[in-house]
Amino acid sequence: MKKKTTLSEEDQALFRQLMAGTRKIKQDTIVHRPQRKKISEVPVKRLIQEQADASHYFSDEFQPLLNTEGPVKYVRPDVSHFEAKKLRRGDYSPELFLDLHGLTQLQAKQELGALIAACRREHVFCACVMHGHGKHILKQQTPLWLAQHPHVMAFHQAPKEYGGDAALLVLIEVEEWLPPELT
């Protein structure tokens, strides 16, 4: 451990003499802005309403025309078929995951609606929905529900690393993100 160097009496007197008449500097060059609250803190009531609104699109009576041969896939008419190819190849990696194992059809619809609402709110354009194998009820219904939602651009059977034929990768249409205004 190093010893502190002490100043001699002469050096201390010289220092006090040189510092006589000085005053403390007022900090006026850097202004620290107050930290803003996170935008993602959404009230619970709004989350419940978004979930209910998003699950409104899912009907059990309507049967969209989906290709039954090969892997499960869908592309909205106004979207390029190349997007489904990108999903199949794994070019998009999902940021949000939803596991539907053990849920009823009603619960699964509500959770799908909540997932789509969360993707739009958080500006996430790719999500993974794991429906599992089970009794094939959710496996059959999930693509039918997703094809009905207007914000679903495309979906494709997930690559092996995301669940294979027991999961779907979904492309969600998100609004253009603008940074919040600094005031």
From Swiss-Prot:
Enzyme nomenclature, EC number: 3.1.-.-
Pfam families documented for this protein: Smr
Domain Smr: 98-173
Keywords: Endonuclease, Hydrolase, Nuclease, RNA-binding, rRNA-binding
Keyword set includes Membrane: no
TM regions (residue ranges): none
Domain of life of the source: Bacteria
Enzyme class: hydrolase
Example of a GO MF term: RNA endonuclease activity
GO biological process: rescue of stalled ribosome
UniProt keyword annotation of Cell cycle present: no
Similarity comment: family membership: Belongs to the SmrB family.
Subunit organization: Associates with collided ribosomes, but not with correctly translating polysomes.
Alphabetized PANTHER family for the sequence: DNA ENDONUCLEASE SMRA-RELATED (PTHR35562), UPF0115 PROTEIN YFCN (PTHR35562:SF1)
Function: Acts as a ribosome collision sensor. Detects stalled/collided disomes (pairs of ribosomes where the leading ribosome is stalled and a second ribosome has collided with it) and endonucleolytically cleaves mRNA at the 5' boundary of the stalled ribosome. Stalled/collided disomes form a new interface (primarily via the 30S subunits) that binds SmrB. Cleaved mRNA becomes available for tmRNA ligation, leading to ribosomal subunit dissociation and rescue of stalled ribosomes.
Name the UniProt record assigns to this protein: Ribosome rescue factor SmrB
Organism: Escherichia coli (strain 55989 / EAEC)
